[in-house]
């Protein structure tokens, strides 16, 4: 039977249509950044968006689902990056076809529908297909052999082959405990002419038998002892790689030969000017443009940490392969339009964000190209000596100075049959961290040794608390007593003081007894559940065991709470106004203001800032109550609360609802949104590539800021003698008048230069056939000096000229040499001869140079020496 040819677009559509006809709801691909699991770096399978359903913490309005999911495997446990470009089937980014049953159908329907789609829709030859089942899964085996009719010799039982009970290629587990079950994989046989054996055989890693579809049957719940019991509602989770299936249906062996990749490879060849489209580096570039573009679309900007660093590694790997092909200027970002052409219909978000994606990649590309050549020279020099291992310190220098991720250096070395001393690299990295720690001013809490009990935190409910001193520290060491005037750290058994965490600064206040007063200047965590109160004992003495009263500075706490609460509301507004790609990159919340760093690739416009302010202040006016609930992490995920990637959350978390915002947060907050009072953005700017910063104030500080602006406006209006309502018009008129006067001044200076040129020309002295002139011009600026110089050179013919102007102690110099004389005299040398005597230096072209100086007293002698200086050189 002849297998028809399907394009990638055909496969996506036919897959979804098939399962829709079987009662499945078509579900849109979720982002590459998982929204329900901050511990997972990237979405790496189709089931990620349904994880909460499988865990029983979420329900959907459907029991059958199908989707085409974008996936990424380039970081953490699931990392295919180093293999991309070297094999036929490894990718960073790929698409996963899948169908799911949530307590509805089970093995029979799943396997029969898979067989129907493959053999009747895609027309794959039945004799080319075989399946594996878990050795103990007789039900799946019987469905394959007795109901579908697959010959027993083409249904392979796979047992526990990974060193333990239920440890098998054909037994799937979500985690060490919880939902699990057997799976059945479908393989395609490329034929005996291709090397490799069937699954389960010693030669199974060959290319003959290729897995195309995995059907996972979640029918058990595993406990901590490894025992399983049946789930009340078994589920089905299947996944089939789109690129692998396309290669089979398009009658090619490598995924890179399918229509989608061929279009991208040809585009990469166009931009790198390479004729041979079989070049492996083109495959790398074609793969990486998919990964990087979709990452940007989902809010991941190149950076030096977390997901952003994985993005940076992929971008720079693609650029390095282009450089290897001879491309010395930015090219990678130009492929975005080609990607949109082949994938924009299936994923409209990349078409909608095409300009933004292109710009993000362009900025990153230009940044790396600035250092790439120098880095490659160092790498080439290090490898030229014939050593088989690149020293770790060299790899670290490439990383630290030239922005070479370690895997990029590994990539280059592997191409040359060499390896990298990764242990040496890590040693160099650790040494740098130690130096940074030693050079920095670290707070005392980092070095304190505390072995006592955790303290109770009562600061959500109270601002004052009776407590007992359980530990004291002075100069980093434990002591039994602090005396008046000593700085130290106090640890209490219970405290209302909030310790610095999550961007919120620590509380200030007072710890006191009848005879002692300790001023708390900051509160920091010694351990996760032990707070250190840093400050100075202003009077009396304080001993371990003393009963004390701990009181938080209520005004500072209230102001800090306003700023922290508004940060949550602002974060929500930023995502609504700028887009879902906005992700928090850092924050600082204190009593003065809130500072919020977020992923966004361009300045926030004045109109956008006004809309953000409008939305936030609307939430404040609504005066809705704040609600904080403590729950387990899985329940929190089910509520849709925003979580930050990289944050370590415990089993129990605090979910904060404030306005329309819902986030995990352990900070202190206002009781109602109206307590914030007023919100005003006071600053916006860039802090790194793809990261913007907004600063804002609230409450009394916002009012003070607006009153200050009003005062400035009033002063400007008074100076211009205009009502504030007419200020813009009056300023516009004044600017027009200034521009007109500037034109008049420029014209007068031009006339002055012309007249001075006529007068000065007569002062030139002939030195061996060259007219030499050194003179001072009164009231001239740099432009007047240059204009006068040009007129003098025209008048004098062969000439060497120095002109000077003085403003206070500052000297401006211009030197000019007619072109015919530049072989003997350089204007730069001439101007520096004079500049060196007036405390300055300069430079320029052989026929014109400028300089400045700071010692006008040396100018007369310097100008007087010009004639002799020229005479020595002609």
Curated annotation (Swiss-Prot):
SUPFAM superfamilies: Class II aaRS and biotin synthetases (SSF55681), Putative anticodon-binding domain of alanyl-tRNA synthetase (AlaRS) (SSF101353), ThrRS/AlaRS common domain (SSF55186), Translation proteins (SSF50447). One of its GO terms (cellular component) is cytosol. Pfam families: DHHA1 (PF02272), tRNA-synt_2c (PF01411), tRNA_SAD (PF07973). It is found in: Cytoplasm. Its cofactor is Zn(2+). InterPro entries: aa-tRNA-synth_II/BPL/LPL, Ala-tRNA-lgiase_IIc, Ala-tRNA-ligase_IIc_anticod-bd, Ala-tRNA-synth_IIc_core, Ala-tRNA-synth_IIc_N, Ala-tRNA_ligase, Ala_tRNA_ligase_euk/bac, DHHA1_dom. Binds 1 zinc ion per subunit. Zn(2+) binds at residues 564, 568, 665, 669. Keywords: Aminoacyl-tRNA synthetase, ATP-binding, Cytoplasm, Ligase, Metal-binding, Nucleotide-binding, Protein biosynthesis, RNA-binding, tRNA-binding, Zinc. Its EC number is 6.1.1.7. The keyword Lipoprotein does not apply. Its main location: cytoplasm. It is an enzyme of class 6 (ligase). Belongs to the class-II aminoacyl-tRNA synthetase family. Catalyzes the attachment of alanine to tRNA(Ala) in a two-step reaction: alanine is first activated by ATP to form Ala-AMP and then transferred to the acceptor end of tRNA(Ala). Also edits incorrectly charged Ser-tRNA(Ala) and Gly-tRNA(Ala) via its editing domain. Consists of three domains; the N-terminal catalytic domain, the editing domain and the C-terminal C-Ala domain. The editing domain removes incorrectly charged amino acids, while the C-Ala domain, along with tRNA(Ala), serves as a bridge to cooperatively bring together the editing and aminoacylation centers thus stimulating deacylation of misacylated tRNAs. This is Alanine--tRNA ligase. It comes from Delftia acidovorans (strain DSM 14801 / SPH-1). The lineage of its organism: Bacteria, Pseudomonadati, Pseudomonadota, Betaproteobacteria, Burkholderiales.
């Amino acid at each position: 039977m002849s297998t028809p040819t399907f394009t990638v677009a055909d496969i996506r559509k036919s897959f979804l249509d098939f399962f829709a006809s079987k009662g499945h709801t078509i579900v849109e691909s979720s982002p590459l950044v998982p929204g329900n699991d901050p511990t997972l770096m990237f979405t790496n399978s189709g089931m990620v968006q349904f994880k909460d359903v499988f865990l029983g913490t979420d329900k959907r309005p459907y029991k059958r689902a199908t989707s085409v999911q974008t996936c990424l495997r380039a970081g953490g446990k699931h990392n295919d990056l180093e293999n991309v470009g070297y094999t036929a089937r490894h990718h960073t980014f790929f698409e996963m076809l899948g169908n799911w049953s949530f307590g509805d159908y089970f093995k029979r329907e799943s396997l029969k529908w898979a067989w129907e789609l493959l053999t009747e829709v895609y027309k794959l030859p039945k004799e080319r297909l075989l399946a594996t089942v878990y050795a103990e899964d007789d039900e799946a085996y019987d469905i394959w052999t007795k109901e579908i009719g697959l010959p027993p010799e083409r249904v392979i039982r796979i047992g526990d082959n990974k060193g333990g009970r239920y440890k098998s290629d054909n037994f799937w587990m979500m985690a060490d405990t919880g939902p699990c079950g057997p799976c059945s994989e479908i393989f395609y046989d490329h034929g005996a002419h291709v090397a490799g054996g069937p699954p389960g055989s010693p030669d199974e890693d060959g290319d003959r038998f290729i897995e195309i579809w995995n059907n996972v049957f979640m029918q058990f719940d595993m406990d901590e002892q490894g025992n399983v019991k049946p789930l009340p509602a078994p589920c089905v989770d299947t996944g089939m790689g789109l690129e692998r299936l396309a290669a089979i249906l398009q009658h090619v062996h490598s995924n890179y030969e399918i229509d989608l990749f061929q279009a991208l490879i040809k585009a990469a060849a166009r931009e790198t000017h390479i004729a041979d489209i079989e070049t492996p580096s083109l495959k790398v570039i074609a793969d990486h443009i998919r990964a990087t573009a979709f990452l940007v679309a989902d809010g991941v900007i190149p950076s030096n940490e977390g997901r952003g660093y994985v993005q940076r590694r992929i971008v720079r790997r693609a650029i390095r392969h282009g450089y290897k092909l001879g491309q010395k200027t930015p090219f990678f970002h130009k492929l975005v339009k080609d990607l949109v052409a082949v994938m924009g219909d299936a994923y409209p978000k990349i078409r909608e964000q095409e300009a933004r994606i292109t710009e993000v990649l362009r900025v990153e590309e230009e940044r790396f190209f600035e250092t790439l050549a120098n880095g490659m020279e160092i790498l080439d020099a290090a490898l030229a000596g014939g050593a088989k291992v690149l020293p770790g310190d060299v790899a670290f220098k490439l990383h630290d100075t030239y922005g070479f991720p370690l895997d990029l250096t590994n990539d280059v070395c592997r191409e040359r049959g060499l390896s990298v001393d990764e242990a040496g690299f890590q040693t160099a990295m650790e040494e740098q961290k130690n130096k940074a720690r030693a050079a920095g001013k670290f707070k005392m809490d980092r070095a304190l040794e505390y072995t006592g009990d955790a303290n109770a935190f009562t600061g959500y409910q109270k601002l004052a608390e009776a407590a007992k001193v359980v530990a004291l520290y002075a100069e980093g060491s434990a002591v039994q007593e602090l005396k008046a005037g000593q700085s130290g750290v106090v640890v209490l058994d219970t405290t209302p003081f909030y310790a610095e965490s999550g961007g919120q600064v620590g509380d200030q206040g007072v710890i006191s007894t009848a005879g002692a007063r300790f001023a708390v200047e900051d509160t920091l965590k010694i351990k996760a559940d032990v707070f250190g109160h840093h400050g100075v004992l202003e009077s009396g003495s304080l001993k371990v065991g003393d009963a004390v009263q701990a009181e938080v500075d209520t005004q500072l706490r209230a102001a800090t709470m306003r700023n922290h609460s508004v940060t949550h509301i602002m974060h929500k507004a930023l995502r609504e106004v700028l887009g879902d790609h906005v992700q928090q990159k850092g924050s600082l919340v204190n009593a003065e203001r809130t500072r919020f760093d977020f992923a966004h690739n361009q300045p926030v416009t004045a109109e956008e800032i006004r809309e953000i302010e409008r939305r936030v202040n609307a939430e404040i006016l609504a005066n809705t109550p704040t609600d904080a609930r403590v729950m387990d992490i899985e329940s929190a995920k089910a509520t849709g609360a925003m979580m930050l990637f990289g944050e370590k959350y415990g089993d129990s978390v605090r979910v904060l609802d404030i306005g329309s915002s819902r986030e995990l947060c352990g900070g202190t907050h206002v009781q109602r949104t109206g307590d914030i009072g007023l919100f005003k953005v006071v600053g916006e700017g860039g802090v790194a590539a793809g990261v913007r910063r907004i600063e804002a104030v609230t409450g009394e500080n916002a009012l003070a800021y607006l009153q200050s602006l009003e005062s400035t406006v009033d002063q400007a209006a008074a100076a211009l003698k205009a009502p504030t309502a007419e200020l813009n018009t009056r300023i516009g008129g004044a600017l027009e008048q200034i521009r007109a006067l500037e034109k008049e001044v420029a014209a007068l200076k031009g006339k002055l230069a012309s007249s001075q040129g006529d007068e000065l020309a007569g002062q030139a002295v002939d030195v061996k056939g060259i007219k030499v002139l050194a003179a001072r011009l009164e009231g001239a600026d740099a432009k007047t000096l240059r204009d006068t110089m040009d007129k003098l050179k025209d008048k004098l013919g062969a000439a060497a000229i120095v002109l000077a102007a003085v403003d206070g102690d500052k000297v401006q110099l211009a030197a000019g040499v007619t072109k015919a004389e530049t072989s003997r005299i350089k204007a730069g040398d001439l101007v520096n001869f004079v500049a060196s005597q007036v405390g300055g230096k300069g430079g320029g072209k052989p026929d014109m140079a400028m300089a400045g100086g700071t010692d006008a007293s040396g100018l007369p002698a310097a100008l007087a020496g010009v004639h002799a200086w020229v005479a020595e050189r002609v």
